[in-house]
Amino acid sequence: MLIAVNEPYALMVQPDDILISPREVDEHFGTMVCFHPRYALGDHHNYMDKDDFLREMYLDTVGHDEAGMKRYERMVNIVSSRFRHGPKTEERAIDEAMQKVISEKYLMLPLYLYDHSGLAMSTESFSGRASHAEWDCGQVGWIYVS
């Protein structure tokens, strides 16, 4: 247990013996959409993968109709034609283009997981600020709010 006192306040930090996710019992501001092969992270969702999630968010922003789908396909084709440096570079560019449009309607931050003798999540990468982070961390999803 840790205690910090700064009159008139006192802060006490102690281990939580109740192993219930606060996201299940408390109200929360954002929705966490995560993808991980071993852990159930974030809020429940039905997206197959991050591409499915980003496409749905994009279409929710521009419209779930034929015009929205054409705009999505046109954006993917334009971005793909500009990047010939490998599939990962192209995929990253498409993701960034979609997120730029999504940001017109949603505030969305990346979620990173640090998996080393326990789990920690952050909206900033752990690389450079945690030991072994270059091997034990990576982006697992997003948290968003409209």
Locations of regions flagged by a protein language model:
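Acidic interaction surfaces
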Residues: 1-146
